[in-house]
Amino acid sequence: LYSSAASDVYKRQEIEELASKIRKMKEDGTHLCCSIGFLTEKQALMLKEAGLDRINHNLNSSRAYYSRICSTHTFEQRVQNIKMLQRLGFEICSGGIIGMGESKEDVVDMLLELREIQPEALPINFLLPIPGTPLGDADISELTTEYCMKVLCLARLLVPQSDIRCAAGREVYFKGEEKKLLSVVDSIFASGYLTADGQGIKDTIRTITDAGFTYEIESA
């Protein structure tokens, strides 16, 4: 799994350069996933022809709450982007972030939207407030281990066909409760996230084996 995060607006040269890198990495059979924002159908086809397997495009929150966290585009635009990518044959990785001020109803609504999308992978992130950012002072008192477990269990129940993944926040909200976490999810992330450090590969493997589980590594 190789992930490349990029901006929402691309020039043809940028897509061509990315396609070239994808072709190179596919030489050893690596399963590739890119987190790349919005694409036109033509751009997506260029990446598909280069061998890209999966694209990450999170819903992030519910349809009703989305405008509270993003002003540059709409929730429906994200849904339509995902549908276009599915139509072209891409696997989809799509999930959300918990702890941005949304209600419990918003969490349920987001998961119901994801059930309609049926992504191959569904990552759940738990907010890690970063000072100086718009959510730097977010109230995360509700993000107890019990509540976070309920969210993951609900994802498992509502979207059973997806690979349920625990991403950002697992080292904080599940510290000492890793066995419970691993009993619910299919996979966890290691070695950090887009805006925060995380548990390294060796420590993550130790966490998994100490909890009595075996592991497979999806990485490049």
Where on the chain are the PLM-derived regions?
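Single conserved hydrophobic/aromatic residue that forms the stacking wall/gate
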Residues: 1-10
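Active-site beta-loop-alpha junctions enriched in small/polar residues
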Residues: 7-8, 35-41, 60-62, 95-101, ...
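A short acidic, helix-capping loop that chelates divalent metal ions and anchors anionic groups
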Residues: 8, 63-69, 131-136
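Canonical radical SAM enzyme core domain
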Residues: 11-54, 59-63, 98-106
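Alpha-helix-loop-beta-strand connector modules within alpha/beta enzyme cores
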Residues: 12-36, 75-93, 139-161
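Structural preference for beta-strand elements that scaffold enzyme active sites
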Residues: 31-33, 54-56, 91-93, 121, ...
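Catalytic cores of alpha/beta
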Residues: 40-47, 101-113, 172-183
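Auxiliary Fe-S-binding modules of radical SAM enzymes
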Residues: 115-220
